């Protein structure tokens, strides 16, 4: 059995995230991450390969945390499950505000030294696939079709709406207590109104 790691990955990724949020992507050098996390630079290079590897891991961890909450959303009907998925975005931002800020304010292309490589793109596509599949399933269940327009309507309610709300309130400490209820009502209205179209 391997010995436990002396420097926990989450501590390293938290340090990288904090540096990026405080000073932008350039503030998160390997040396700065090493100093902030207490992990030797050699450990960082061994575990992540380079600075881009650390920052990509921090960003993907935030995305994974968001998606875990979104995919866990459940309710009695497809429409209410879609609404719960929208509200999950607000809950994520409330529980993990630094991760939400990282996802909202920093694009991978801005975070990394170059464009995200093929491996990053492949990982991102694989991570997004279940969410996209679920949105398509909602479109079929709610509107009887998974054509582009129906999928877009569901995406507006469960993804675009909470994204815009969280973006507006991401730096509020604390976020307003009424956000979940308002996002639920708004998402429900978008889904219902699209279902009533001629």
Where are these regions (language model features)?
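Secondary-structure edge/capping motif, primarily at the C-terminal ends of alpha-helices
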Residues: 70-74, 104-111, 142, 165, ...
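Hydrophobic alpha-helical connector segments
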Residues: 57, 71-98, 155-158
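Short, charged helix-capping/linker segments at alpha-helix termini
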Residues: 26-27, 51, 144-151
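Amphipathic C-terminal alpha-helical segment
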Residues: 95, 137, 141, 155-177, ...
């Amino acid at each position: 059995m391997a010995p436990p790691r002396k420097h926990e990955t989450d501590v390293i990724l938290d340090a990288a995230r904090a540096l990026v949020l405080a000073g932008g992507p350039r503030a998160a050098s390997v040396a700065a991450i090493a100093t902030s996390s207490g992990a030797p630079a050699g450990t960082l290079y061994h575990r992540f390969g380079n600075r881009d590897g650390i920052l990509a891991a921090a960003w993907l961890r935030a995305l994974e945390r968001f998606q875990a909450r979104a995919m866990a959303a459940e309710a009695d009907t497809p429409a209410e499950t879609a609404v719960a998925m929208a509200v999950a975005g607000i809950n994520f931002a409330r529980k993990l505000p630094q991760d939400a800020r990282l996802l909202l304010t920093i694009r991978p292309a801005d975070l990394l030294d170059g464009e995200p490589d093929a491996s990053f793109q492949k990982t991102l596509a694989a991570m997004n696939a279940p969410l996209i599949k679920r949105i398509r399933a909602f479109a079929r269940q709610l509107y009887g079709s998974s054509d582009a327009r129906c999928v877009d309507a569901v995406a507006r309610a469960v993804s675009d709406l909470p994204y815009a709300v969280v973006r507006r309130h991401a730096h509020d400490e604390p976020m307003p207590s009424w956000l979940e209820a308002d996002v639920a009502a708004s998402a429900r209205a978008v889904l219902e109104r699209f279902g009533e179209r001629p």
